[in-house]
Amino acid sequence: VGGVRPGVCGAVASPGSPLSYWAGAEGENPMGDAGGLAGGSWVTALTSDLGNGKFDGGHLVENFESLNPANTLWSKNYDLWSKVDTEAARFIEFEKWWGGHVNLNAEEIQWIVDELFIGNRLATAEITTRAGDRIDLRNIRSPIICFCSEGDNITPPQQALGWIVDLYANDDDLRAYGQTIVYTVHDTV
């Protein structure tokens, strides 16, 4: 909303959200590489076709789980049972959240994959609304607060923060837009 109507919202929080989809450290966090190896967005279209026009968000969870099979198959359960007296509530809460994925229709997921993951058009201000308004994150006039972590293999810091260097040439450019951006990078969480 802030990228289209600058005066409408207050501070904008971005908790580990990918905004610069092409960013990443070479050889780490292979989600983008995995998508490229599949040959683009045809897998998304096929999956939606097989789902009769629906895309089950469980496929996204499956992709994330495959990033670290050792955690999925061993560590997660080991941690639960090694701390069974204290870990059960946290484990159940996380699994409910993690398994509470969203279902999308074919058009929605195809747009997300083509425009964001492949096109990287949000970070480069190339997305327009149906009304023709350009979504430009530089238009946000509220402070932007970003949280990210080196331990996040789904949204590494480069994807959470890379939009800043995609949109602003340098600190002076950022100041010229009157923007305030505060971010923190945790080492492990």
Residue ranges and their predicted role:
Residues V1, D152-I154:
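Short strand->helix junction
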Residues W98-R134:
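Mobile cap/lid helix-loop segments that gate and shape the active-site cleft of serine hydrolases
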Residues G2-Q110:
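Alpha/beta-hydrolase-fold enzymes
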Residues E26, A176-V189:
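C-terminal catalytic histidine-bearing segment of alpha/beta-hydrolase fold enzymes
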Residues A160-D171:
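Short, well-ordered amphipathic alpha-helices
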Residues V4-G10, A169-Y177:
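Secondary-structure transition/capping motifs at alpha-helix termini
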Residues I154-A160:
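Conserved alpha/beta-hydrolase "acid-adjacent" motif
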Residues I140, C146-C148, D152:
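Short beta-strand/loop motif that positions the catalytic acidic residue
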